[in-house]
């Protein structure tokens, strides 16, 4: 299985912390945010190739980090060539570029590099292996305004995703999909087809939504919480939470 971490954003809401330093490498609980995800995946033994896609501004920091990071396979860093938030490619284009440049295809785990989970990704992988579909995660969101900023799912029997809509004005349910995905057979060509077919380029959930209406996709009920670090306040809150755990 391939693993691709999306880390090409500019995290402008965390300035000045992230003006010249990538958000996924900010430290929480004594190590970079991205380390928590990688250290959780490593014991599964399922990752054959691993990549992080970033931008030209942050590529040197990621290359230094990857050279020192212990992981079962080399961590390949892809530079998408952008240098400003205004010229960013968007997560879906970054994913396409990564698969194309590294000649990756097949089973692929895709995740944002700036989220933390309080449960193991091994459970998500087990859920994926138990079926024969693509998979994403889901949690119930009660706050109407937060719902409108999420990827919202419409579900059928057996956790099957009937539809997914990014940032809907009128959410069809309270099921949100965070940026963690498992694809059975992903390729640069499939993503290019999605983009030609009207798939949004910015949010990674746009690709999941496009695929979900064309290929069977199930939604894993999250057994715990995820921590989305989007602002200085949320970063400080997550840091305090992890420090309180010792």
Regions found by a protein language model. Give the residues of each.
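Conserved N-terminal catalytic core of the sugar/cofactor nucleotidyltransferase
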Residues: 2-5, 13, 27, 31-111, ...
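Active-site metal-binding loops of divalent metal-dependent hydrolases
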Residues: 10, 113-115
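A structural signal for short hydrophobic beta-strand segments in well-ordered beta-sheet cores
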Residues: 25, 152-155, 219
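Residue-level signal for inorganic ion chemistry
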Residues: 34, 98, 114, 153, ...
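A short, conserved beta-strand element in the Rossmann-like catalytic core
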Residues: 115-118, 226
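Conserved donor-nucleotide/metal-binding helix-loop-beta segment in metal-dependent transferases, i.e.
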Residues: 119-147
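Catalytic-core segments of class I nucleotidyltransferases/pyrophosphorylases
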Residues: 125-129, 157-246
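Conserved catalytic core of nucleotide-sugar-dependent glycosyltransferases
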Residues: 145-162
